[in-house]
Structure formats: C-alpha cells, structure tokens
C-alpha cells in the first residue's frame, strides 16, 4: 500500500481522470485499479435492474466530463449504440466484456434468457460469474486507464497487480468451496440463464426453469417439463433471483420435491464483486450439500 501511495505522490497528477461507469461491478473494478487517480461518475448503481435501465438526459449530463465511459458489454446495455452517437469527440466508450471470452445461450435455453436481445443463440452477457473473467477485466481497465493517463501507468499497474492477486485467491476459494459438494450434486437450478459462465468454470450442470420476469407466467408445457426433469434428477434445491417471479419458482420447487435456496445475485447489481461471489457460492454450497 505504501508503494502505491508513493507512486501516486510521485506521479505529479494535478487532476483526477474523469470516467463514468454504466454497471456497478465495473465501478468496483475501476475503484480497485484507478484509486485516487480517477473520479468515477456512477451511472449504473447497486440495486439497478440492468436489463431495463436506460440512461436519461440527466445521466448524459453527469457524464459530460468523462473521458472514458465504461460498460459491461456483450449487449447487456443494448442502448450503447445510441449512447456512443451522443458522446462528444473527446469521449471514448469502453465495452469491457468485449475483450472477455464469450459463451452463447443455447437454442434450448433461449426461452429462459433475460430478454429478447440475449435469446436465439445470442451471447450470454453475465461474463463476471467466472472469476477469471473479472481478472481479465481488471487488466483491460488497467491498460485503458494507462493509455488515457500515461503518467499514472505505474500506479495503475501496481493496483492492478494487487487486484488480480486477490481475484486469483478468490477463484481458488470458489474451487475449494465447490469441492465440498459431491460431484453428483453439482447441478445448479436457477430462474434465468445467467449462470452459464459460473457453471462452465466450476463444473456444474446448469438448468434454467422460468426466464426473467417478475410478473410473467411460464407456459404450462414448459412448467411441466421443468418439474419432471428436476424430480427425475433428484434436485435438492432451486435458487431464486430478485427479478424472477417467486410464485412460479415456489410451484416448481413444491411439485418437484426441491427446496427453495437462498437467493443468488445474477445480474451483478451490487457494489462489491468479491462479496457477491462469496455470497452466491456460500448460498449454492449450503443448498446443494443438503
């Protein structure tokens, strides 16, 4: 920490670099890497509905001074094309997820996607559920900040090294926690298709049962198929999400013989990436070791 502070003091930066963030997890990463050298305008805040959010005129005004506007990317923010057209010539839009490996939502799972823009073989936008992807994101942010603020290159590099080290430790912690679940029980059942990256990275079979809608209903055939498959597989726990219809999930759990687990944070609308991962993994382990 002393080394990082000295790097900042010696850098001679008179003003912080103005940036804006469209997603809470990106904001967290910006703080980790940018520290005192960046001034962040939080457009996407914790608790937001990332699939329904649209920037307002007041948001555009808030980010007017930002040289860099950071987005999660992978079409999580379908408004980015219009936003980029509205930016000034000195502003640059950075889609962090663009530089992270992608996974597609399969044809059989498209009905369980978060929204139409992510169905029909579209890219799954929830890339952050693989901790190694967030490590990649930190390095992307480091390089982007250093390009805009060359005097801070060493400062950003030092902070990025610290952050990526913490993420590697977090990734190992996740693997250790997952190892306590018998391999035959590593079957993650959630409402919508948001945990594909997590399941691929940490050895789970993913099943989605209703799609993302707090009000919408599930077609009878789809509901019956979900109940039958969960009952046949002996799934002990299904996991709710804040934005999904709790009534439907309760019905699926009751008729399949499963229990309702603790809710998972699917869309990253939280202030701390590490706390989100720890909470999700803790809830998954508690539910599947029953």
Residue ranges and their predicted role:
Residues 16-290:
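Extracytoplasmic metal-acquisition and chelation regions
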Residues 1-2, 290:
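Short, Lys/Arg-enriched, disordered terminal segments
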Residues 2-13:
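Sec-dependent N-terminal signal peptides
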């Amino acid at each position: 920490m002393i080394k990082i502070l000295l790097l900042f003091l010696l850098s001679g930066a008179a003003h912080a670099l103005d940036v804006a963030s469209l997603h809470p997890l990106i904001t967290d990463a910006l703080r980790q890497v940018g520290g005192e050298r960046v001034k962040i305008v939080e457009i996407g805040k914790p608790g937001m509905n990332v699939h329904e959010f649209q920037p307002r005129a007041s948001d555009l005004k808030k980010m007017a001074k930002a040289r860099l506007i950071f987005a999660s990317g992978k079409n999580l923010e379908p408004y980015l094309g219009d936003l980029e057209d509205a930016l000034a010539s000195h502003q640059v839009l950075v889609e962090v997820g663009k530089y992270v490996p992608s996974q597609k939502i399969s044809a059989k799972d498209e009905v369980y996607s978060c929204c139409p823009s992510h169905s029909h073989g579209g890219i799954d936008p929830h890339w952050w559920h693989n901790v190694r992807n967030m490590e990649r994101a930190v390095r992307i942010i480091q390089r982007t900040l250093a390009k805009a603020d060359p005097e801070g290159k060493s400062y950003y590099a030092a902070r990025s090294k610290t952050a990526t080290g913490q993420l590697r430790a977090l990734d190992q912690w996740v693997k250790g926690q997952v190892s306590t679940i018998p391999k035959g029980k590593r079957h993650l059942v959630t409402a919508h298709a948001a945990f594909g990256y997590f399941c691929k990275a940490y050895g789970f079979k993913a099943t989605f049962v209703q799609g993302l809608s707090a009000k919408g209903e599930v077609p009878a055939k789809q509901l019956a198929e979900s109940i039958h498959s969960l009952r046949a597989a002996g799934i002990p726990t299904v996991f709710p999400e804040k934005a999904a219809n709790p009534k439907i999930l309760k019905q699926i759990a009751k008729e399949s013989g499963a229990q309702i687990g603790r809710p998972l944070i699917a869309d990253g609308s939280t202030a701390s990436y590490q706390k989100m991962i720890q909470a999700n993994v803790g809830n998954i382990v508690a539910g599947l070791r029953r």
